[in-house]
Amino acid sequence: MDNKTIFITGAASGIGKATALLFHTQGWIVGACDASQDALDVLSNELTERCPTYCVDVRNSSQLEAAIADFCRQSSGRLDIMFNNAGIAIGGHFEDLPMQKTRDMVDINLVGVLNGFHASIPYLKNTDGALCISTSSSAAIYGAAGMATYTATKYAIKGFTHAMSVELSRFGIRVADVMPGIIDTPLWAGARYKDGEVAGTYEKIPKLNADLTDERRTISPTEVAKAVWSAYHGDRLHWYVPEELERSDKATSADYQKRRDELLNARK
């Protein structure tokens, strides 16, 4: 049997790297795409085979398309998983952030996903049981004050996942997203917002259900990588990490006003 293939954006650190390592240990061929050549070199030293690397900015559709085409050319056009994972988070009150930083988040987090979908669909169509999965966030559940633009991009990914899961079903392509909580990764380390008014908000929010004890714990990238593995072998639209977030998502969807009031009260 031929090796299965996965192409990962944002592959050289955090969730992307953990996913690359996990799938590689399972015998998959991993296409590792990242904007940092230095980080890719480190990954290449860890995965000495079956891991071609591509230094690409996902905002550049032509670069990303060329990288995916080169990767799939090596596998006779096969692509089992496209993992749109690249993203950045910049914290701060919306009015305080330079618009260039806001645009960077939109272009990397959202437009990068659109570019990944568009470039990978021809190869996913050529592969039985293929999956296109993207990294959304628990921010698409709560609406993270102090990270409004990041929240918007993750809500957009969630909605895009819904739409594309229907649109691509005619080709037999599965579509999903992974929705992690707070993760111990470089992305979040660089996004922490020091303003006490914002930073303390989420620690104060009453839990929707008393038994959701793990809802706000810090998550390891490996946990999210395992969810991506499960997504390939499962058939769900959203993969929550931890799973308790699913119940919060359903409760929030049922009553957005109640959730907003909880957030506002927590900041008093």
Residue ranges and their predicted role:
Residues 12-13:
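Conserved glycine-rich cofactor-binding loop
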Residues 56-66, 99:
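The beta1-alpha1 cofactor-binding region of Rossmann-like NAD(H)/NADP(H)-dependent oxidoreductases
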Residues 93-94, 98-106:
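Substrate-binding pocket helix/loop in short-chain dehydrogenase/reductase
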Residues 117, 153:
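Active-site helix of classical SDR
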Residues 122, 166-169:
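Alpha-helical segment proximal to the catalytic Tyr-Lys
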Residues 137:
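Residue(s) in the substrate-gating loop at a strand-loop-helix junction
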Residues 170-240:
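SDR active-site lid
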